A protein has these predicted regions:
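Beta-strand secondary-structure signal
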Residues: 14-18, 44, 86-88, 146-148, ...
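Structured interaction patches on ligand/partner-binding surfaces of diverse proteins
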Residues: 65-67, 95-146, 216-218, 255-263
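Intrinsic-disorder/low-complexity, polar/charged segments enriched in Ser/Thr/Lys/Arg/Asp/Glu/Gln
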Residues: 12-16, 71-73, 144-146, 157, ...
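Bacterial Sec-dependent N-terminal signal peptides
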Residues: 1-20, 160
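Short solvent-exposed capping/turn motifs at the termini of beta-strands
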Residues: 21-23, 164
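A short mid-domain helix/strand-loop element embedded in enzyme catalytic domains
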Residues: 141-142, 150-152, 179-183
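Surface-exposed interaction/gating patches
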Residues: 152-169
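Tryptophan-paired
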Residues: 32-102, 167-263
Length: 263
């Protein structure tokens, strides 16, 4: 008996694998209701056998499970002892848990590469765009796995605050909504190697819909500063990435643009 890579098969073992969404993190909705991953309701598991020079190769098909209580459990995952594997997780929000394979904000059809969904207009300050991932090695698999694997965000969170909102005396002139435009942010990520999908030359970047300013979020650093937006942006792990080409336009509650110079 051989595996799909022409390798002699080891002992077939069925295991249960759990993944947990890391709770806590930056405030995203309001001071009283911080971003804690509670909008995450789907988790995908891809198993990859490490095949020497060919690198990680898909082993079996992708598994989908609903996230409940910030945890997803994958039962009856079958592996062969004696081989090296990578377990690749992606957890995000879907519109309905009755069909977990239907993507929402992020496209996973080329998993383990995940990209923005071009069919969904980008929107700032949207906690359903939160997501988590993790890549874990099983070397010389002996039949044992961790009790649970903790996932982390693949993003840097861009938070924009204003320090002079209170200087606007008329409430009618104070912005209630903003629109963000980005010309150079990554549009996706290879979850296994961490490489980012760069925007195509001349693609025009990412232009968001008009989105409401988060409710009553103040800066933890500058007293009196008010948050205007937050955005989840794919970022390299443990490295800095400069972001250029950011524009913010300002609107009232009725989506009419205000006479405020774009930022």
């Amino acid at each position: 008996e051989e595996t799909g890579f022409g390798l002699p098969a080891g002992e077939e073992v069925t295991v249960t694998i759990s993944a947990s969404v890391l709770s806590g993190g930056p405030s995203v909705k309001s001071n009283a209701d911080p971003g804690n991953g509670d909008q995450i309701n789907r988790c995908i598991l891809g198993v990859y056998m490490v095949d020497g020079e060919n690198g990680p190769q898909p082993y079996g098909t992708l598994s989908y499970e609903q996230v409940t209580g910030q945890q997803a459990t994958f039962e009856d995952v079958t592996l062969l002892t004696g081989y090296d594997y990578k377990l690749v997780f992606w957890a995000d929000n879907v519109a309905s848990t009755t069909n977990l394979q239907t993507d929402n904000h992020y496209v996973t059809t080329d998993f383990p590469t995940v990209t923005y969904n071009d069919g969904h207009q980008y929107m700032s300050s949207d906690d359903t765009r939160d997501a988590f991932y993790g890549v874990f090695d099983l070397n010389d698999f002996s039949g044992e796995v961790e009790d649970s694997y903790t996932l982390t965000r693949p993003f840097g969170q861009l938070n924009i605050f204003t320090t002079d909102c209170d200087e606007i005396k008329s409430d009618a002139l104070k912005p209630a909504k903003v629109r963000m435009t980005f010309t150079s942010i990554p549009t996706g990520m290879d979850l296994i190697n961490g490489s980012l999908t760069e925007p195509a030359e001349g693609a025009g970047g990412v232009t968001g819909e008009i989105s409401a300013i988060p409710d009553d979020v103040t800066s933890p650093v500058v007293t009196g500063a008010r948050q205007l937006s937050f955005d989840y942006i794919f970022a390299p792990e443990g490295q800095q990435r400069m972001i250029s080409g950011i524009t913010m336009n300002f609107y009232d509650a009725n989506d009419s643009e205000l006479d405020i110079t774009a930022y």
